[in-house]
């Protein structure tokens, strides 16, 4: 277990600590997404986002991290696909993510 990447440990600790409270775990959700992206795991970050972040407090932060990651890598296909699926707590936040595709 110790040989696993940091994001795996963070993801697993989130899974153990997560409840149904949309406010709880915001910082840990952001930390999980950051660690996944730092390890080049964009697909894993998206999976985690859609399973645990979207619709909860901090979802815009997580979505912008993922979208920004794709933009920095100049991966327009992944960015467009992600932005097309995102639906955040606030429409204005959703539009911020979509604006990165331009």
Regions found by a protein language model. Give the residues of each.
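Short coil/turn connectors between adjacent alpha-helices in alpha-solenoid helical repeat scaffolds
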Residues: 1, 74-77
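Amphipathic alpha-helical repeat scaffolds
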Residues: 15, 30-34, 50, 64-68
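Generic helix N-cap/helix-start motif at coil->alpha-helix transitions
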Residues: 7, 21-31, 56-65, 90-101
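Alpha-helical repeat scaffolds
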Residues: 7-19, 41-54, 76-89
């Amino acid at each position: 277990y110790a040989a696993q990447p940091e994001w795996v440990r963070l993801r697993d600790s989130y899974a153990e600590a997560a409840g149904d409270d949309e406010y709880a775990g915001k910082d840990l959700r952001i930390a999980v997404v950051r660690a996944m992206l730092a390890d080049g795991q964009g697909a894993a970050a998206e999976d985690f986002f859609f399973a645990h972040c979207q619709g909860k407090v901090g979802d815009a932060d997580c979505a912008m991290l993922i979208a920004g990651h794709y933009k920095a890598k100049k991966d327009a296909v992944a960015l467009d696909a992600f932005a097309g699926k995102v639906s955040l707590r606030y429409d204005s936040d959703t539009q911020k993510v979509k604006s990165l595709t331009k």
